[in-house]
From Swiss-Prot:
Keyword annotations from UniProtKB, A to Z: Membrane, Transmembrane, Transmembrane helix
Protein's UniProt keywords contain Nucleotidyltransferase: no
InterPro entries: SMIM5, SMIM5/18/22
Cysteines engaged in disulfide bonds, as pairs: none
PANTHER family linked to this entry: SMALL INTEGRAL MEMBRANE PROTEIN 5
Domain of life where this protein originates: Eukaryota
Protein name: Small integral membrane protein 5
A Pfam family per the record: SMIM5_18_22
Length: 77
């Protein structure tokens, strides 16, 4: 039951976003700037999330862990 409610809510949000995009050419400059700021903020957050995930997955910030050191013993003559 909750899954269908979620799908319907996402569809409603998508339809509202599409309606806003269709009305954007006739919108006032303040609305265009506000919409642009929201889109830019969302894109920035998604980009930073992608960078953080890729750095975490590639371990570029962490030094490579080395195995245990083994002492070398001299060989008898």
């Amino acid at each position: 039951m909750a899954a269908t409610d979620f799908v319907q809510e996402m569809r409603a949000v998508g339809e509202r976003l599409l309606l806003k995009l269709q009305r954007l050419p006739q919108a006032e400059p303040v609305e265009i700037v506000a919409f642009s700021v929201i889109i830019l903020f969302t894109a920035t957050v998604l980009l930073l999330l992608l960078i953080a995930c890729s750095c975490c997955c590639t371990h570029c910030c962490c030094p490579e862990r080395r195995g245990r050191k083994v002492q070398v013993q001299p060989t008898p003559p």
